[in-house]
Amino acid sequence: MYLTTRLAIALFMGVGICWSSRAEAQKIEGVCFSAPRNEVGDSSIAQVQSIGANWICLMPYAFARTEDAKVRFHPDGGQYWGEMPAGISAMVRMAKARGMKVMLKPHLWLGHGEFTGTYVPDSAIGWKAYEQSYQEYVLYYAKLGHGIGVDLFCIGTEMQAFVQARPIYWNKLIDKVSDAFQGPLTYAANWDEVANFPLWDRMNYIGVDGYFPICAKDRPTVAELEVGWQQHALELARLSTVKERPVLFTEMGYCCTADCAARPWSEDPEAPRDENAQARAWQAFFNVYADKPWYAGCFVWKWFADLPQDEARRGNGFSPQGRAAMNVLRKEFKGQ
């Protein structure tokens, strides 16, 4: 669908979106919990709620070796407490007791550091193993999510090549997940995949992992970062209108580094640490998106439920805990 520049600007400004009042009333202000190794209590949920978050995202991981393409997960043992049914169920109960909502987001890791977005098996045997085992993995957690009252289920994370190569499989998988979960669905598209994901019509939200490169320089100002966001925001507004779905940032985050806006997906432990650069990047994000009616909300990548803030603050990774970025999140989530 062709949109004129004038209409695109109107969409970016939030004009004429039919779900505006509904989206404004239900903004998702969430955090992605890094699955805790050991059992955690209500204080972990309370800490997140203290910054104004109203959702958490739980991520039970699976693992695959490219040699055989089989997706492996171990819900009966062998994974972290926060990835197993007992841990997931406990965290859902604690969140619900505090009036919060939960997204369940199965997340696949590949061996040798390979990116899931470009991986496809290299044989018919590999494809069969990949498809069958991924379906078992996703359906297991869809059924679990339904049973424990999860509010939103994510069917996949950054799997562009798989989706593009096997659209019939994914349509059938969505049918099965819909039957098992019986609730709203999304898919977490990588930032460079979101415009071409073919199945948004079957999702309730356009999900995007929002690691868009927005400024190549070190320590940019908030104003410079806002300029870097403009084209991406226009494209997301256009997509939202065409697909008639709100946009949810299923992951959104910046490392605590001077160049965090240049390659936001990249984590470099040797990069210069800069809390203020991380905080400015977050502030620019909210300045651009928070008042757009097609913006459904975001999940902050990421939050360590089992670490004290002082420990989580160390290094230069994504966590906002104990850093200047946490103050930005608190201000924006609480509307202060």
What are the residue ranges of the model-derived segments?
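Substrate-binding cleft and catalytic face of glycoside hydrolase catalytic domains
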Residues: 54-70, 85-163, 257-259, 301-306
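Aromatic- and acid-rich polysaccharide-binding/catalytic face
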Residues: 138-157, 189-229, 246, 250-258
